[in-house]
């Protein structure tokens, strides 16, 4: 339901990309909900749209789908359902991605989402040989949890930062809870500490959004 705003409050569109296969049992999703609850409490004009990737069942981009996509791009047929994820990304002021740390990166559904969001003349265009992003977002937040330490193998966050930067979202913050499955660690305490950092990050971002000119 649209939020009714008072006075000169600026509506903030937030896209929440939920790439958590375990649903509400996911520790990553719990971390994300903590962040989103804190942010929307501080920024009541924030409108959250959730892109739940597992019920979405995005189709892998094969040769036939790629040909259809290119033809639709040529016609700028942005109302075609194929472009719905890209349209939502392009319009978002804030992008929040929740994805568990799997196999040195993230679940495959998130890569499918990226493939559906790279849309010529909608989320990016070319100036000569240079790719220029067209998304309006000012900030992206990437939230993840890992059973083991991630260390230098943070390929998922690094990849998503590069993708979003290419599409025009320059500011990127990654936040994680790591080592949750190690016997010597207190998983609850580690997750709780990450949730506290998530709430603090939400406060920082809410302050930045309130300071932006209307």
What are these regions (language model features)?
Residues 2-99, 104-119, 196-214:
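N-terminal beta1-alpha1-beta2 submodule of the flavodoxin-like/Rossmannoid cofactor-binding fold
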Residues 13, 47, 138-139, 171:
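Residues at the starts of beta-strands that form the adenosine-phosphate
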Residues 19, 145, 177:
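Cofactor-binding loop segments of dinucleotide-utilizing enzymes, especially the Rossmann-like FAD-
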Residues 21-23, 147-150, 181:
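Short histidine/acidic/glycine/proline-rich micro-motifs that form metal-
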Residues 61-64, 153, 185:
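Short, well-ordered secondary-structure micro-motifs
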Residues 120-124:
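Short catalytic/binding micro-motifs of nucleotide second-messenger systems
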Residues 126-169:
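Short, glycine-/small-residue-rich phosphate/pyrophosphate-handling segment
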Residues 157-214:
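Glycine-rich phosphate/pyrophosphate-binding loop and the adjoining helix
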């Amino acid at each position: 339901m649209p939020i009714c705003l008072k006075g000169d409050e600026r509506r903030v569109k937030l896209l929440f990309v939920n790439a958590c296969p375990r649903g509400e049992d996911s520790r990553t999703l719990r971390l994300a909900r903590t962040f989103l609850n804190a942010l929307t409490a501080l920024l009541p004009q924030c409108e959250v749209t959730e892109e739940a990737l597992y019920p979405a069942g995005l189709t892998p981009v094969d040769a036939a789908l790629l040909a259809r996509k290119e033809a639709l791009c040529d016609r700028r047929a942005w109302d075609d359902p194929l472009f719905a994820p890209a349209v939502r990304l392009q319009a978002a002021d804030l992008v929040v991605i929740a994805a568990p740390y799997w196999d040195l990166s993230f679940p495959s559904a998130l890569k499918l989402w990226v493939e559906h969001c790279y849309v010529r003349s909608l989320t990016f265009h070319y100036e000569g040989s240079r790719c220029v992003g067209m998304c309006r977002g000012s900030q992206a937040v990437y939230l993840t949890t890992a059973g083991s330490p991630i260390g230098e193998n943070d390929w998922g966050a690094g990849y998503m930062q590069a993708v979003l930067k290419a599409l025009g979202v320059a500011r990127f913050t990654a936040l994680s809870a790591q080592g949750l499955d190690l016997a010597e660690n207190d998983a609850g305490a580690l997750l709780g500490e990450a949730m506290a950092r998530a709430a603090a990050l939400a406060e920082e971002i809410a302050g930045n959004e309130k300071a932006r000119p209307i």
